[in-house]
Amino acid sequence: MNFNINILGTGGTRPLHNRYLTSVLIEYHGESFLFDCGEATQMSLRKQKISWQKIKMICITHLHADHITGLLGIVMLMAQSGNTRKEPLTIIGPIGIKKYLETNIELLRVHKNYDIIYKEIIINKTESILYEDKKKRIEYIKLKHSIDCVGYLFIEKNKPGKFDTQKAESLNIPKGPIRKKLQEGHEVILNEKKILPSDILGEPQKGLKFAYITDTAYSEELSTHIKNFNLVIIESTFKNELKEEAKKKLHLTAKLAAKITKKAKVHQTGLIHFSERYTLNKDLFELLDEAKQEYPNGEIFLTKDGMRLKANKDKFIIK
């Protein structure tokens, strides 16, 4: 299965020597999708030997510096790397993302040899589905922060079940294009008889569901958007002792993050976007402990810069 999630950075506010700013990249069947792009994101791509030329889309949650200041560098990098990019780059984000980037491109006289397609989100007006093809779709959800902010859902569509050769032979379905069409989910007419994919395919395989959520205050409604998701990467900026500060700044504690995923019955929860004050491992493990106490039956882990998660059946395995 070619579905990987790469953790490029896990910090908030400013980059540290061992913790870059929060950014996540999905590799899916030869295409890449980047979520947030703070300062030094391109350094993470280089360290993890990830091709920036394969990035099809960049999705920005909100226009705060720690989530967008690496964007111009990525745009420049794509233009300077051997002039090989042919496909346009799609950039998605709240209103203002186009003005931010185009102003910088103009002021710095950045030369780019490819097109940029902008899709600006007008919260509560823009249709929730931002992108869709035969295998997947990307949606946004409204978050509660000090400025317009969205979370992103990456939803893999259900895949056809296993092909039953014996059933195909019993129905006299010849090998070749007809079988392939049925495997792709299309009905066919054979000898004046309609044959459905369900006639020769097993139960459909459920697609995986992934969510990226940062920065936001606690909201009961948030859980409704991520019900039974396989993996949710969610901000855990503060320890519970700073819950009032989290509330004031419209952020989450690790405990509140776990409360959200517990209510949604999320299978795996990855904590991310740690406050710069937490520089010691013991601080991060305290965040993890607080989350596990809230959701003891959930699979919860700390994300780390350089971590790679690989899809394996109905879950993601840390590599």
Swiss-Prot record:
Homology family: Belongs to the RNase Z family.
Keywords, alphabetical: Endonuclease, Hydrolase, Metal-binding, Nuclease, tRNA processing, Zinc
Cofactor, how bound (note): Binds 2 Zn(2+) ions.
SUPFAM superfamilies: Metallo-hydrolase/oxidoreductase (SSF56281)
Residue numbers binding Zn(2+) 2: D66, H67, D215, H273
Domain of life, per lineage: Bacteria
Disulfide bonds: none
GO molecular function annotation: 3'-tRNA processing endoribonuclease activity; zinc ion binding
Cofactor needs: Zn(2+)
Source organism of the structure: Borrelia turicatae (strain 91E135)
Protein name: Ribonuclease Z
Gene designation per UniProt: rnz
Catalytic center residues: D66
